[in-house]
Amino acid sequence: MLVWLAEHLVKYFSGFNVFSYLTFRAIVSLLTALFISLWMGPRLIGWLQKLQIGQVVRNDGPESHFSKRGTPTMGGLMILTSITISVLMWAYPSNPYVWCVLFVLLGYGIVGFVDDYRKVVRKNTDGLIARWKYFWQSVIALVVAFTMYCIGKDTPATQLVVPFFKDIMPQLGLLYILLSYFVIVGTSNAVNLTDGLDGLAIMPTVFVAAGMGLVAWATGNVNFAAYLHIPYIRHAGELVIVCTAIVGAGLGFLWFNTYPAQVFMGDVGSLALGGALGTIAVLLRQEFLLVIMGGVFVMETLSVILQVGSFKLRGQRIFRMAPIHHHYELKGWPEPRVIVRFWIISLMLVLIGLATLKVR
């Protein structure tokens, strides 16, 4: 909204023209979200401790996690607040793509909040009933998917970009809605599954958001889009502001979530962040790229699917415990080692994903 204000003030002082530059707004969006998150952290943690809103640890989990019982959770509230304020300050309010991401972010945040509330206040370790969680995730995803289809059905915004092939971009039509639905819901749940160790989910989220921010900048620039042979999407540039806000809020949260964590993000954070990343990828037509960049999330999800499938079909487990980060814990890896190695893998995958934009 400051952009609109600056447009009115620029006639009085030309210096306000800096607010029209995307790179400037991206940087200050990151810093704004970072500082808000750092400011909120101690206050939110103190408030959660006062209300005794602490993590509920399952009895069948790794023994090393029993010491985490009672650690404040629902810290995702600081992430969502930081992102929302920063985006509203620095993005163009007229951009429909920005509102699509915010709708998913806040909608999934509410679903996650209800889930966390049932866990930590009602002391129900199962949280929100799975079918109801999936129902509301589906409703939100379908509303946004249909909205995005209506916005972009007559533009390249409904094409499917295939890595390594610059001339293969099929027009999806109504299938765009179905694909968008699965990407948004799937990414949301994948990040949620990854959020099992201190800082494990937030850094891959930061890396992927940073990578998607670069893609958004290229997609919204007609010259770079043509150079990289990706669809030029007029509204996509403003998603850079959303991505940098996620990066800033994520780094601010990591300040308090790094091992040993002072606060956990809870489902209010993980479901919302995953949904936001999925929505951004769909808007940029980079669903395949998200699979590469978010490979850690994919790996965690596949480990659960394989574990459950193997146990039901053969009566045997593939891993000592799923998601796979627990498998390495039970193998004797210290928690910080698991976390940092997964971070390194995530960074490598984001760089590989960015490289695929040119390798065509």
From Swiss-Prot:
Residues passing through the membrane, by range: 27-47, 72-92, 94-114, 132-152, 168-188, 199-219, 236-256, 263-283, 288-308, 338-358
Cell compartments where the protein resides: Cell inner membrane
GO biological process entries: cell division; cell wall organization; peptidoglycan biosynthetic process; regulation of cell shape
EC numbers, comma separated: 2.7.8.13
Biological role: Catalyzes the initial step of the lipid cycle reactions in the biosynthesis of the cell wall peptidoglycan: transfers peptidoglycan precursor phospho-MurNAc-pentapeptide from UDP-MurNAc-pentapeptide onto the lipid carrier undecaprenyl phosphate, yielding undecaprenyl-pyrophosphoryl-MurNAc-pentapeptide, known as lipid I.
HAMAP family: MraY (MF_00038)
Protein name: Phospho-N-acetylmuramoyl-pentapeptide-transferase
Organism from which the protein derives: Edwardsiella ictaluri (strain 93-146)
Name of the coding gene: mraY
